[in-house]
From Swiss-Prot:
Note, other: Present with 2960 molecules/cell in log phase SD medium.
Transit peptide found in the keyword field: yes
Subunit structure: Interacts with CCR4, ISA1 and ISA2.
Keyword Chaperone attached: no
Keywords for this protein: Mitochondrion, Transit peptide
MF terms in GO: transferase activity
InterPro entries for this protein: TrmE/GcvT_dom1 (IPR027266), YgfZ/GcvT (IPR045179), YgfZ/GcvT_CS (IPR017703)
Localization annotation: Mitochondrion matrix
Transit peptide feature range: 1-27
Family: Belongs to the GcvT family. CAF17/IBA57 subfamily.
Induction annotation: Up-regulated during calcium shortage.
Gene: IBA57
Protein name per the record: Iron-sulfur cluster assembly factor IBA57, mitochondrial
Amino acid sequence: MFISRRCRIKGFTLKNLLWFRSSSTRFVSTESPDASAITKPDGIFNYSLLENRTYIRIRGPDTVKFLNGLVTSKLLPHFIKKNLTTVEENEVPTEEGTTKVDPIIPVPEFDARLGNWGLYNEKGIQGPYISRFGLYSAFLNGKGKLITDTIIYPTPVTVSEQISNYPEYLLELHGNVVDKILHVLQTHKLANKIKFEKIDHSSLKTWDVEVQFPNLPKDIENPWFDNLLDPMALPKNSIDANNFAVNVLNSLFNSDPRILGIYVERRTESMSRHYSTFPQSFRVVTSEQVDDLSKLFNFNVFDFPFQVNKKASVQVREIRFQKGLIDSTEDYISETLLPLELNFDFFPNTISTNKGCYVGQELTARTYATGILRKRLVPVKLDNYQLLDTDPERKYAEFHIDNVVEKSLAENEPTLNPFTNKPPERTKRKQRPAGLLISNEGLYGVALLRTEHFSAAFSSDEPVEFYITTTKGENIKITPQKPFWFSDWKNNNGPHK
């Protein structure tokens, strides 16, 4: 194997991206491996064609300013006139879970109205950076509720100076919410110099990709940091960002022009830092001509064989729920949840706390500042999940801390009625639910769990049991799984916030 102590793939810089090569590289077909095989393949490539994805193309000189006022991410830097050699301190997580201090180097001032320059990201290894890869963000309504999450792709992945005079992006949305977002864009357009259009769903394809190296030693750093995640967060201008994207596109996809957008998953970075074998996920947007993404992937750039698996979209959803992540309004009801309840504050550059005004900002900023948040999304496992299929209340089903239905009703103190001679009666009140099941795919799902139950669910030697009671009186056991951000939450908030 090619693995060194730090598993560094040589030659990976902004100017020259060269993955470790070998003339003996082998390719493993999509056929299932022999069950009797003792060793795992050195590389695993899982991919899936996602359904019901629709895109809005938006472009024009005011595009960045316009989107910056609508989404939760900071897309437009607030420039402060100062010496660009001035640096500030920036704490970033390390593999050991501690922090190191890196200098903050600001992005030099530029005209965001001109050129297809990419996306501004507020926080990176050395402060803000410019990227040509997608950004996970969200649209909120005026009350701060989530209309939909979205991925904003600079498109195409790479550009030459003469291609476009203005910024251009693709907004990835589920088909059931695209018309609502078109209405939001139209309502706020006013005099902004932008153009946007819904792209026919048959014109583009959306692929989920997961690349894993299962045989890596446990005591080394996950190679995706040295080779992709860290260097992609370094460019301070559009030229370096484009050069890096050119190298990545060439190395992984042989510069195939049918690749129109790439999103590098960063929401699970903390898991990647703790586990060297944790897979790196991507979202890839292609033209409709692509029938099999694995045929575009450049396996020859790696020095080991790969097992290639085409997954069904439901399998991708199961894996996503195991990580405690939602993805599009397929997983939740629009305008019913707060972004912080969905842990968007734990995702890099998904929510900005200092960008200023945007739709839904007031409640989001106040909640973040006070730290008072009573529920958060966690992964869960369900027993007898089949019972949910026939339950009309399966969306956002309440679950309680006890499996006995009668115990969900607590008795109030007896109340004396002054207008009757009858003795005082005890009334029953419904116990507050411990949480809500947001969505599931078979055994796995995601649920809002009240933070007051976190200690019992994740830190107790004898975890409590939670149950959903269906309309037929049947019980479904629901077991919360410790989320990847739990340690950070516990350190910052304590067990009862």
